[in-house]
Amino acid sequence: MISIFNFELFKKRLNLFLEKIEDLGGEVEPLTIEKPATEEEIKAVEAQLGYTLPPHFREVLLENTAHLEFWWYLYHFLQKNKDFLPDEICGIFQGKLRFGLDLLLLYEEHRAGWQKDVFPNYEDEYDRVWHNKMFFQKVFNGDYIAIELEPDNYGKVVYVSHDGSENHGLYIADNFKEFLMNYAAVGWTGGEDWQWEPFYTKDKGIDPTCENAQTWYKVLGINPKELEG
């Protein structure tokens, strides 16, 4: 199911999960997709950040949407149906995606504050993960999902923890577009790391072809072919 970036297919995947979650009695919000940003709007934010946005992220803002929101919540259903999810994916209860050009400066303010006050030591392995990142999604538990700005792994999507998660600094996609397509194919579970971790495969990142993803599709009543173009 690994696929090249296709925004229409990406939307199809997200809407399919909203449909399945709603059918179960879960809570959902309509997928929100705002119009693309202009070159001038992007350059204005880049000037304040002090760098050019990573290319895959920049292209999505410019060609597809300047702001997107996706959300579902299955917690109450799962409390009443405690055996619905098998053990290997039992930590899943919601899915949330929220990114936008309008959020970048706020998230950079958060990142810079944490770096200065809590993680200032670039020579420390844990602290270093908070340096030279472009935060684009805030996770409910206070963690972030970011894009690497260091030259060695530039453009990769990385999980950034504030409280000692073993997944701190873990790369979960080679680039933003791959991240969107693969994460959408499992319904954007989380974004807390314990909700996407069942779908993580070493050297592949979030992997919609893994065994746990097939289990997830089965319990939701999704035929994997429905997630294809």
Regions found by a protein language model. Name each.
Residues 184-229:
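Acidic, proline/glycine-rich low-complexity IDRs
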